Amino acid sequence: MKILKQSDFPTPPVAEIIPDTFTNFGQQRIDNYFWLKDKSNPKVIEYLKAENAYTDSVTASTKALQQVIFDEIVGRMKEDDESYPSFEDGYYYYSRTEKGKQYRTYCRRKGSMEAPEEVIFDVNAMAEGKPAFIFSGYSISPDNAKAVYFYNETGSYAEFKMKIKDLASGEDIGFSMDGVASAAWANDNKTLFYSLIDKTLRSSAIYRQTLDAPAGELIYKETDVRFSAYVSGSKTKQYIFITSASSTTSEERYISADRPTDRFKVFLPRVQDVEYSVYPHKEKFFVRYKDKENLNGLIYEMPLTGYEDRAAWKPFMPHDKNVRIEGIDILKDYVLLELRKNGLTEIQVKPVSGAGETETIAFPEPVYSAWLSGNPEYDAAAFRYSYTSLNRPTTLYEYNIGTKETKKLKEQEIPSGFNPGDYTVERLWATAPDGVQVPMAIVYKNGLKKNGGNPAL
C-alpha cells in the first residue's frame, strides 16, 4: 500500500480573508469568511468549484470504491416509495418518491384513498433545470383551497422564498416573499402571518398580510438578539401564536385565528430562565413549563380566561427529577406525552381530565428510538408513532386508545433484504469510576458465542 504525502496532492485552494465585524452581547466578533455565505457572489461559486475540483483530484484513485459504496447504500433504499396517508380536514395527504428522481411528489385525495389523486406539488418539475433546489414544506389553508409553500434555489437551508398556490388552478396567487422562516393562516383564508429573517439569519420580525395587499404590516419585532421569533397556528384551529425563544427563556403571544386584525396578547410575560409552551385544548390550555427548579419540566392545565392568576393553574403532570418531558400532543379526550426516562423515550397516554389510567406504550426491544408521528386530527381516537431499533427499520404504528390495539401501518423496506429476527439487541450497564451507571446498547447476530473473543465496533 502506498503511503500518500501532501506533496502527492495539488495545492489546495485558499479562501480569501475578508473580515466582517459583528457586535453581539456587547462584544465584537470578526468573521473572516462570512462572505462565503453569499451564494450569489461569483467569487463564492468560483471558490466552491475550486474546492470540488481539488476534492475530485485527491480522491481520484478511490472512484471505483466510491461507486461500490454508493451502490450498496442505494441497495438499502427503496427508491420508489409512498408514505402512509395522513387524514386532515377531509383529505388524505401523502407523498411519494420515484426511481431515478431526486425529489418527492406531494399529493392528496378527498374523502378516501379511492378518490382521484390531486398532485399538490411535483417538486421534480419545480426543480427541473435549476442547479440547486430545496423544498421546505407547505401549509394548507383552512378552506383546503390554497397552500403556502417554501423553497429556495440557492441550496441554503437558512433562507426560503414563500409563495401561495391556488390548488384548483395550480397557479401561484397573491404575494411572494423572500427570507420567510415560518407562516400561519388565519381562518378567513386570506390573511397570512409570517416571520422574516434578518441579515444574521435570525427570524425576528412578524408580519400580517392579506393575499391582495401590496405589502405586509409589521406586527411584532423581536429586538433582543438572543431571541428568535416564529409564528404558528394551533391544532384546534382556534389561535395564532408568536413564540419568542432563546436557549433558556421563552415567551408566547396569541390571538384568535377568527380575528386576525386583533392585537396579540402576551400569554405569560418573559422571565429569565423560564421556558414554556402553550398547547390549546378547546376547553383549556395545557402548558409545558420549565425553570431552574424544574429542569425536566412539568405540565399545568389552565382555564381559557383568568389564567393570569397563578392560583388558577392546576398541576397536570408534576415535575420528576428522573423523567424529562420532551413532547406533548393534544387530542380532544387525551394528552399524548413523549418522555425521556433512563435514556429512552416513553410514550404515554393520559386522559384530558387528569383522572383515570395513564397508559404507557410497550416496545419490543430494550434499546430503541420512538416518537409521536403525524397526528393532525384533534378529534382522533387513535394516534400514530414511529419506532426503530438497532435491529428494526423505522416502522409507523397506530394505537387505538379505546380498543388498546396496535396496528402496523408501514415498515421501511430494505430492498437488498433484511430480517430483524436474525439479530438480538441487549442493553447493559457499565459502572463509571464515579459510580454512575452508563447504559450500553449491543446488537449481534443470533448464535454468537459469548466467549470474549468477538471483535466490537
Question: Can you name each region flagged by the protein language model?
Answer:
Residues 187-256:
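Solenoidal tandem-repeat scaffolds enriched in leucines and small polar residues
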Residues 166-178, 212-223, 258-268, 307-318, ...:
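Blade-edge beta-strand/turn elements of extracellular beta-propeller
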Residues 455-457:
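Hydrophobic beta-strand anchors of alpha/beta hydrolase catalytic cores
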Residues 107-110, 163-168, 206-212, 253-258, ...:
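Beta-propeller blade signature
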Residues 301, 308-330:
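Generic long, charged, amphipathic alpha-helical segments
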Residues 46-139, 228-280, 288, 314-315, ...:
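Non-catalytic accessory segments flanking enzyme active sites
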Residues 1-59, 63, 67-81:
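N-terminal pre-domain segments of enzymes
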